[in-house]
UniProtKB/Swiss-Prot annotation:
PANTHER family listed in its UniProt record: 39S RIBOSOMAL PROTEIN L18, MITOCHONDRIAL (PTHR12899), LARGE RIBOSOMAL SUBUNIT PROTEIN UL18M (PTHR12899:SF3)
Subunit structure comment from the entry: Part of the 50S ribosomal subunit; part of the 5S rRNA/L5/L18/L25 subcomplex. Contacts the 5S and 23S rRNAs.
Record keywords, A-Z: Ribonucleoprotein, Ribosomal protein, RNA-binding, rRNA-binding
Pfam families with a match to the protein in the record: Ribosomal_L18p
GO molecular function: 5S rRNA binding; structural constituent of ribosome
GO cellular component: cytosolic large ribosomal subunit
Superkingdom per UniProt: Bacteria
Organism: Orientia tsutsugamushi (strain Ikeda) (Rickettsia tsutsugamushi)
Cited CDD domains: Ribosomal_L18_L5e
Family the UniProt entry places it in: Belongs to the universal ribosomal protein uL18 family.
Function: This is one of the proteins that bind and probably mediate the attachment of the 5S RNA into the large ribosomal subunit, where it forms part of the central protuberance.
Keyword rRNA-binding: yes
Keyword Ribosomal protein: yes
Name listed for the protein in its UniProt record: Large ribosomal subunit protein uL18
């Protein structure tokens, strides 16, 4: 049986292959990284096959969110605020629709909360 790291890598590769097909339409992708304490999200525009440009980024380390953080651990409430902050920053740059790149993470918990927060102002 495969261990959790192998399953994560398989899931990540499967998600990235699906996104590669969708982002060929010119949509930027909303990429998510989660650590034990923080969650990070960024809107990335792919330029060619090997280059990419970060349009907007937000995390629980941003001053707007970090001052409200009661615990040094990300939860659903703060993940939703990160999604909302990222959506505002992307809208200010003229981005209205993105492709959600969850990486190898399951669409559950803080990943779902971040997506719901971003979905309030972005289309995906």
């Amino acid at each position: 049986m495969r261990d959790s790291k192998d399953r994560f890598i398989i899931r990540k590769n499967r998600v990235r292959a699906k996104i590669a097909k969708l982002s060929g339409g010119g949509y930027p992708r909303l990429s998510v990284f989660k650590s034990n304490r923080h969650i990070y999200a960024q809107v990335i525009e792919n330029i060619g096959s090997n280059k990419s440009n970060t349009i907007a980024a937000a995390s629980t380390l941003d001053r707007d969110i970090f001052t409200e953080l009661k615990y040094y651990k990300c939860n659903i409430q703060y993940a939703k605020k990160v999604g909302q902050l990222l959506a505002e920053r992307a809208n200010s740059k003229g981005i209205t629709s993105v492709v959600f790149d969850r990486g190898g993470y399951k669409y559950h918990g803080v990943i779902k909360a971040l997506a719901d927060g971003a979905r309030e102002k972005l289309n995906f």
